[in-house]
């Protein structure tokens, strides 16, 4: 599968044209919120949840996701969606089971890579570009400081207690893919095999052309 096909299938994955940096001057309340979100995200080492995804074209799919920081994530889509997404070894891999085709890109070039860092920092290499406050909810918009062309990520939290509820990835064409977490469960242990993948061309490999 080539990059054009991957972009069409999952717009949240690929870098492209750069976003203009958004000016954001955090208030004292914003700084408290940013610190609380940092602490919360760094407190999550493992997370399992059902998910519901809405693509830019309105297509809805779901499945189960596992997050194991640092660096590991798996999205197993329910039928009829034939997709599998696995992050490990610094790579985000996408496999289309129906076509038996695989593509991968560096995790560091994806917005989701921010969540999988060994230590999540919402300053320095990552910048907060805005905070929205809604009844019972707070939304942080973030992007990589040095490579805004990777896209941006909006993290939505229930505010009391602070709980990650949803994220929205905006691609360089301003198209949004929204993922809502259902019944998330933090902690526990996962089988390491969840984050392994063997393509016909070799372990955790596949076409990247």
Please give the residue ranges for each predicted region.
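An acidic-aromatic
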Residues: 64-114, 177-178, 183
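Extracytoplasmic
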Residues: 44-46, 60-62, 68-70, 80, ...
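N-terminal secretory signal peptides and thylakoid transit peptides that target proteins
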Residues: 1-14
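Boundary at the C-terminal end of the N-terminal hydrophobic targeting segment
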Residues: 18-25
